[in-house]
Amino acid sequence: MKLNMGKRELELDGKYLGRLREANDLMGNPEALRARMQEDGYLLIRRLHDPEKVKAVRRVLIDNLAANGQIDCSHPLDEAWIAPGARGAFMGGAKAVTHSPEFLDVVEAPELMQFFSDFLGGPSLTYNYKWLRAVGAGDFTGAHYDVVYMGRGTRNLYTVWTPLGDVPFNKGPLAILEGSQHFERVKATYGQMDVDRDHVTGWFSNDPLELIEQYGGRWLT
C-alpha cells in the first residue's frame, strides 16, 4: 500500500514507512509504560476514550465546520465531506468548540487524567489552551516537535494526539519519526524554539525523506 505524506509517496511496511507499536498490553503497569515511552518516544493506546463521547464531539466539530463553509452539505453530514476549495481549519485557544462540554468530556476525561496521574506518579494537569485542527484533503502538517508550540511554561509535559473518529490510512493518521526523541542536535537547536517568541511556523521540515536521510529512522503510522 502506498501512502502520500506531503509531496512524497511512501510504501507502507517499506524502507521509509512502518507501523507504530501498540502499548495496550502494558495498561495497568505504569513502570512498563514509562520504560516503553523511554524506548519508543510514544505510546499507542487504543480505546482509551469512550467511543460515544468521541462521536458526540465529532458531531459538534462537524456542525462547526459546516457553519463555516468547510463541509460539503450535499453529502450526509456525518460523513464530513470537505467542501470544494476548503483547506481545513485551526480551532485552538479561545475558540468556543475547544471549550464545549462535549470536547472537554474527551480531552479532559477522568480516564485520561487518571492515566497520566498513574503514568507520572502524581496528580496531572492539562492546559486550558487546546490545539484542535481539521486538515484538508491532500494537505499535511509538516514535521515538528510539539514542544516548540507548547513548551514555554514547562518542558515536563506529554501531548495526546486524539483522532475524533476512525482514521484509516487514507484519511491522514498520525506519523512519528522513529527515534526522533534522541536527535540531540535537533533538540538543542530547533527544539529550543518557541513559535510565539521567535515568530516561526514551528515546522522543522515539510519533506519527510529529508529527515530520514539526514538523521535516520523511518516514519511510523
Locate the predicted segments by residue.
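Short, structured patches in soluble enzyme cores that scaffold and shape functional sites
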Residues: 131, 145-147, 162-166, 178
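Short, conserved beta-strand element in jelly-roll/cupin
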Residues: 119, 150-169, 205
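Residues that flank catalytic or metal-binding motifs in active/ligand-binding sites
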Residues: 99, 127-128, 156, 160, ...
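Conserved hydrophobic/aromatic beta-strand scaffold that supports enzyme active sites
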Residues: 42-44, 159-163, 217-219
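Double-stranded beta-helix
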Residues: 170-221
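Short loop segments at secondary-structure junctions
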Residues: 47-49, 164-168, 179-181
